[in-house]
Amino acid sequence: MELIYHSANVLLATIKDVLPIIGVILFFQLVVIRKKIENLGRLVYGSLLVVIGLAIFLVGLEEGLFPLGEAMSRQLTNFHFLAKGNASLLEKIEKTGIIDPNLYFWTYIFAFLIGFSTTIAEPALIAVALKAKEVSTGAISFWGLRIAVAIGVAIGISLGCYRIISGTPLHWYIVVGYVVVICQTYFAPKMIIPLAYDLGGVTTSTVTVPLVAALGIGLASNIPGRSVIIDAFGLI
């Protein structure tokens, strides 16, 4: 019963969020362009599906993906899991609270795989990849583009997890990252540069963000000496 009540509240909140978008479109269509809306019934039906779909998705995030990401982080950072039956190592970890970042290799592997798989499934990336293939008349591969972006995101999330675990300052990663991007921009083909920057914006969206955010919060919450506010964010 509580879940139904919560779902209804999320649906109402989603309607409120979508109404301004509909208002802007109607204003420009009826007041500025001054033309009737074609296929009105189909548009209304599609809009209803968007609202209902968003509401279901948001409830799913809260009830499924966020808890899942935090649970995986908690299990992968558990002292007993890290010690792997080594009693002396477990005793040392429990006494000092200091853990070698290299012991978290399963966390890095999980971060890489979850980053890759969620990016491949990202609807925004799929939409841009389809358009890129269409306007380039097949010169840009649909799957090649998605896989290349997914590998980049996977590496980035793995590095982000290492940053949280090791306590390395975030600004070093940002500075190095921007230097690499600037160099790539200088040497990359002109055709790919605008698309690459757009992909940087759409890559982390509805599918990737919830799991990655939950992963970061889970890591910062379960690693000694880490702050959820300072260390948990920055992965995305």
Give names to the regions the model predicted.
Residues 4-16, 41, 77, 93-102, ...:
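Interfacial loop-to-helix junctions that mark the boundaries of transmembrane helices
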Residues 46-67, 152-155:
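A generic, lipid-embedded transmembrane alpha helix
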Residues 56-72, 83-94, 120-123, 167:
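Transmembrane alpha-helix boundary signature
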Residues 161, 214-232:
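Transmembrane helix-loop junctions at the membrane interface of multipass transporters and ion channels
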Residues 86-87, 103-184:
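Helix-loop-helix junctions within the multi-pass membrane cores of secondary transporters/permeases
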Residues 15-28, 214-216:
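The first (N-terminal) embedded transmembrane alpha-helix
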Residues 26-38, 124-134, 183-196:
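C-terminal ends of transmembrane helices
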Residues 37-53, 233-235:
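Alpha-helical transmembrane segments and their helix-start/interface "positive-inside/aromatic belt" motifs
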